[in-house]
Amino acid sequence: MGHSSYLTGAPSSEPQSIEESLYELENTSVLFREAWQRVPPDFVRASRASAKAMAHLDHLVNEILRARDTRIARGTYAGSQLEADLNIMRGKMFAPVTVAQQQAMIAAGPGSGNLPGDAVQITLERLLNKVKHRHHQSANFRIEASRHIFVINVDRPNKMPDSIAEFDVSDFCTHCIQAAKHL
């Protein structure tokens, strides 16, 4: 619901468009990384940037998956440019995982998020689904060669551990920009 402010008279804090969310996600990732790498780290600023980034990430994921589902329902997805864009390898995943492995990823501490073993590459479409079904309070990250890598725990619908996935936030945004052109 993009423009709900008319209902309450208050300005909406919801993202207005996919393009805006992509822009904001890229920017907040940079702000987060800079705050985290300061000496001493600026945890307040990093936390604020992270919260803002998550709102934009969720908006992007929901909009792209909704558009995909609409195209599937209309019979216009198979063979489309959107399908091609979503089939690009864009993240990594380690599966199956145990609860202990998911807990260890968090226990490693902020900035030390890693997959517990050899990963397989996953498509942007699969990554979007992993992001959608992530533990919202169970994520980590690392800064690697000035890149912000987001690491997430994912469960199956029955709440059993499914996987741990990771992606480079900047690369994710670049590929979502391409996919958004074909929604």
Give the role of each language-model region.
Residues 2-55, 62, 69-183:
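Acidic, Ser/Thr/Gly/Pro-rich intrinsically disordered interaction regions
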